[in-house]
Amino acid sequence: GLALGLKPTKTIYDLAVSGGTLDADKIDGFLSQHPSGARALMAPLRPDQAAAIGTPFLREVFEILRSRFDFVLVDTPPAFTAEVIAAVDVSTHLCVVGMLDALSLKDTKIGLETLEQMGYDPNAITFVLNRADSDVGIAASDVEQLLGRAPDLTVGSDRAIPRALTSGQPIVVAEPRSKAAGSYTSL
């Protein structure tokens, strides 16, 4: 929510502890509205709240959202927790983001290999290389050799990104003519 400038009044934790029957109308009451028209089910405010949300509940929420919206985006942490696996299991497409530093590339390689072992279709994964023009000792052209897969999209470093994050707007809204916005629009 922070990157979208949304202040959570209700979160998925509040939905989980609200009791009663879970359906699309109930979920609607817990969605935050972005000025662009996008709606967001906000993350829990504290780690203890996140721990109280079970994966069966998440799976049910994801299925209801998928039946209701054309696109459901789930921003996950970079680890294969039970919650992340629940999101992956109901996904039709994944976007894996990595950067040019050695640790990120190692984690990206492990993540892509894990998804393959889980039986996820590699053609349904978009690999985005973020800050692809950074001079960190690894060239973007080396990534395919290191990971066994070329990035589907490269996004260069752009000062417009932190400005957009600070303003709470997506880069394509805050600075639509920026290089980064052009890259993300092609996604």
Which ranges hold each PLM region?
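Phosphate-binding loop that captures ATP/GTP phosphates
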Residues: 1-40
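Conserved catalytic-core segment of NTP-binding enzymes
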Residues: 2, 52-157, 162-163
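Residue-level signature of the cytosolic catalytic core of signaling kinases
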Residues: 8, 20-23, 54, 157, ...
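C-terminal boundary of histidine-terminating zinc-finger modules
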Residues: 12, 167-184
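Flexible beta-alpha connector loops of hexameric P-loop NTPases
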Residues: 12-20, 45-53, 100-103
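Residue-level signature of catalytic and energy-coupling elements of molecular machines
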Residues: 41, 75, 155, 184-187
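P-loop NTPase motor core of the ASCE superfamily
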Residues: 139-140, 147, 179-187
